[in-house]
Amino acid sequence: MRFLLQSITLVAAARAASIDLESLFGPYVSPETEIAEVGDADFDEVVSPRWSEWRPPTWTGAIKPQTEEDLQEIVRIAVANNVSFMATSGGHGTSLIYGTVKGLDINLANFNNVDIDLESNTVTVGAGAKLGDITEPLYKAGKAIQTARGNSPCVGVIGATIGGGIGYETGLFGLGVDALVSVRIITATGELITANETCNSDLLWAIRGAGANFGIITAATFKMFDQPNNGDAVIGTFVYNSSKSLGVFEYLSVLDNVLPPELGVQLSIGYDRTINETLLTVDIKHFAPWATFVDHWEHAEALGPISRNVSNVTLVELYAGLDGPCQTGAYVSGGTVGLGRTDAATMQEVFDDMTAFYEQYPGYLGQSLFQRYANNNTLKTPAHTAVYPWRDTKMFWLHENIFLNPELEAPTNELLVSLREKLHATSGFPADQPHIYVNYAFGDEGPEAWWSKENLPKLSYLKRKWDPKGVFGKGTPIPRF
């Protein structure tokens, strides 16, 4: 391994207004590492793909390291030469702040290993592994983990988890960060270290909810669980027209205190332009035998759906079908707020506001999602084990603005903020304490909303310790002072 001083000495002359990336990095990384400037014929093959066209970073080049040693050298050289960079995997992160980022893309796609250890009951995944990469190996092993499963198969495992890690199996297994037992992480000095309960435990605390701010995680190890229901699930999709909206919202409020752990529910508000009507879709994922699903089916049927589809599937089939966010080319921004209670009247206001917006802007394709997972197991984990603060959230609202014309950005941003304020006002949480799940953040909420006022002093201290120059975590930055 080459040492930092050697790298600095040899590349110091490369500092200039225009940096030749091949000259800067090429001599110090393995031959398999790919380097491309913007405009090179192979740039699109080296840079990480992005899901959304909204506020993307401006890349000055891209590099795809082959080994951890390559990645260490890249970080050392970039920091020494004031080359801004951002490590990427699935390319699904969005934030208002990303549009201000200019720098080098470090594509982690080559770190896509998935290693199951039945003896220790853990699985280790590389930085480039996608959720689709882990589903079948876990299924064949009869195991499961809660690492934000419920996201699409093209989403990066680690990125989707280190902000909290919610998904359809949250009721059964709790948060993804609570199953995170160890990481290998490259810090701002280029050092590769381990963080677990016995080594750098404070850093592990910070990674469990704010991991993107402290380095590049090359591998993460998670505790596994026995697969629920022998790897099978019952899934039901029920679609309702606008006349049923309030009844559907009232049904959702019934689940506030009686949601069983094996049940995951997502309600979405969207618009069907073939019939020019706002529709509600209730997706139910039931990780238990068919017989125990019947009550939920009967409730959904009693609300009068215009269509329904119910089937038995394997977990592999279930998660392979969640491929919506794998489609690229549109402008997509996201925003969120956590809810401690379901207020049907407020949800009806959201429905009405979105209907008016759909009718005013024919090019708008967005949707609002309300995600319900039992939080009993989430609450069982002591709060002091992770910086993730919002364990009392009962329902996660995720609003996705989707449009093809960039001129719609301003009105869609206003819609998102307006809906967020309405929902927070009746969320059951204090007015000055919005519960923002950082993985869904719009980008304007601020660190107190992402990690809580109580956690910020310790979190800022650790940021100063591990990343004093703020080279990591550009999308949701931690204040250092």
From Swiss-Prot:
Positions bearing carbohydrate: N82, N196, N241, N276, N309, N312, N376
- Ranges for domain FAD-binding PCMH-type: 52-227
Query: To what use is this protein put?
Result: Asperfuranone provides anti-proliferative activity in human non-small cell lung cancer cells.
Which GO CC terms are listed, alphabetically? Answer: extracellular region
Question: What EC number(s) is this enzyme filed under?
Answer: 1.-.-.-
Top-level class of the enzyme under EC nomenclature: oxidoreductase
**Induction (UniProt):** Expression is regulated by the asperfuranone cluster transcription factor afoA.
Q: Which GO terms fall under molecular function for this chain's record?
A: FAD binding; oxidoreductase activity
Q: Name one GO biological process term.
A: asperfuranone biosynthetic process
Write the record's keywords in alphabetical order, separated by commas: FAD, Flavoprotein, Glycoprotein, Oxidoreductase, Signal
Q: Where is the signal peptide?
A: 1-16
User: Acyltransferase as a keyword?
Assistant: no
Family label: Belongs to the oxygen-dependent FAD-linked oxidoreductase family.
What task does this protein carry out?
FAD-linked oxidoreductase; part of the gene cluster that mediates the biosynthesis of asperfuranone, a probable antitumor agent. The polyketide synthase afoG is responsible for producing the 3,5-dimethyloctadienone moiety from acetyl-CoA, three malonyl-CoA, and two S-adenosyl methionines (SAM). The 3,5-dimethyloctadienone moiety is then loaded onto the SAT domain of afoE and extended with four malonyl-CoA and one SAM, which leads to the formation of 2,4-dihydroxy-6-(5,7-dimethyl-2-oxo-trans-3-trans-5-nonadienyl)-3-methylbenzaldehyde (compound 2) after reductive release and aldol condensation.
UniProt-recorded name of the protein: FAD-linked oxidoreductase afoF
